[in-house]
A protein has these predicted regions:
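N-terminal cap/lid segment of alpha/beta-hydrolase-fold proteins
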Residues: 5-28, 233
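Conserved HGGG/HGGXW glycine-rich cap/lid loop of the alpha/beta-hydrolase fold
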Residues: 21-79
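Conserved acidic catalytic loop of the alpha/beta-hydrolase fold
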Residues: 89-107
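Conserved hydrolase catalytic core segment
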Residues: 105-144
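A catalytic-pocket lid/entrance helix-loop region that shapes and gates access to the active site
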Residues: 128-180
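Short beta-strand/loop motif that positions the catalytic acidic residue
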Residues: 255-256, 262-264
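Conserved alpha/beta-hydrolase "acid-adjacent" motif
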Residues: 269-275
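Catalytic active-site module of serine/aspartate enzymes centered on a nucleophile-bearing elbow/loop
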Residues: 286-317
Length: 317
């Protein structure tokens, strides 16, 4: 029987700071592990999710120099939940600015969920900066993938779906929930915005694990987390789709030479496995690992084990 790998022990950053991205956004970054180690950048999900202490623990701290940053409006970056100057293109520029400011010639890129979207977009624009890609829970920002979020909730977590709809005023319940939440999250009353943000964030957290994780769900309702996640995610879903929508698949040829591993939960309700399979088939030389007893979250035991194992393998190459 295969023994599952656990995360590395908790670790504190040896350096942290802020990147003044523009006149609006101040981005939090940190480094942990070995300052002279193999550089890897962690790209969090959402968009709007932010990094956590757990994000540091997929990498051997003796061998990796781990760079983490909270994307625009997320986590410890400010202003919280800010939508101005917040697009995929802005985040790609931020990544390059951060890499150069930290004196890194090229790095390994590690991202899951929305982090996989950003990793692909970044690598396709800057392949020379990417030593490898390790991706989990693939999301390509296509219309049907966005709609799948609601379909999965309605069909597999009906209680969570009903709670999501209950937050909408009666006149918005029959329409597109994405547009309904966009209205609530832009409401002039902060209390209305925050209540809607919590409903949205909790709904998504309920779908993240094969068996819903009460700790994750409780954390999703925390004010700063929920506000950034809901506002930024709805903003991106409405305004930052690709044209053509399969652009990230079409441009894989730009990074075919970059080593890639794709880790995907078989029962992922947020990012269904077909997307990971399509990416793998479009990317000659990529490796696909399907974890049969897992949902979406990187903390699912099988996914966690696969990610730690992959990063250990990269460190020994």
């Amino acid at each position: 029987m295969t023994t599952l790998r656990d995360l590395y022990p908790e670790i504190e950053p040896y350096a942290s700071g802020r990147l003044e991205a523009d006149e609006i956004h101040s981005l939090y970054w940190e480094e942990c592990g070995n300052p002279k180690g193999i550089p890897v950048v962690f790209l969090h999900g959402g968009p709007g999710g932010g990094c956590s202490a757990t994000s540091r623990r997929y990498f051997d701290p003796a061998r990796y120099r781990v760079v983490l940053f909270d994307q625009r409006g997320a986590g410890r970056s400010t202003p919280n939940g800010e939508l101005r100057n917040n697009t995929t293109a802005h985040l790609i520029v931020d990544l390059e600015t951060l890499r150069k400011s930290r004196g890194i010639d090229a790095w390994h890129v590690f991202g899951g969920s929305w982090g996989s979207t950003l990793a692909l977009a970044y690598a396709q624009d800057h392949p020379e900066a990417c030593l490898s890609l390790t991706l989990r829970g693939i999301f390509l920002m296509r219309e049907w993938e966005i709609r799948w979020l609601f379909e999965a909730g309605r069909k597999f977590r009906p209680e969570a779906w009903e709670a999501l709809l209950d937050a909408l005023p009666p006149e918005l319940r029959e329409g597109d929930p994405l547009e309904g939440y966009a209205k609530l999250l832009d409401h002039p009353d902060h209390a209305v915005r925050l209540s809607a943000a919590r409903r949205w964030s909790v709904f998504e957290a309920t779908l993240a694990n094969l068996i819903p994780d009460s700790t994750r769900i409780a954390g999703a309702s925390e004010e700063q987390v929920a506000y950034a996640m809901a506002r930024i995610e709805v903003h991106y879903f409405r305004n930052n789709r690709y044209e053509p929508e399969d652009q990230l698949l079409r441009r894989v040829e730009r990074i075919c030479h970059v080593p890639a591993t794709i880790v995907q939960g078989r029962y992922d309700l947020l990012c269904p496995p077909i997307t990971a399979i399509q990416l793998h088939r479009a990317w000659p030389g990529s490796r696909l690992i399907i974890v049969d007893d897992a949902g979406h979250s990187a903390t699912e035991p099988g996914i966690r084990s696969a990610l730690v194992t992959v990063m250990d393998e990269i460190a020994t190459q």
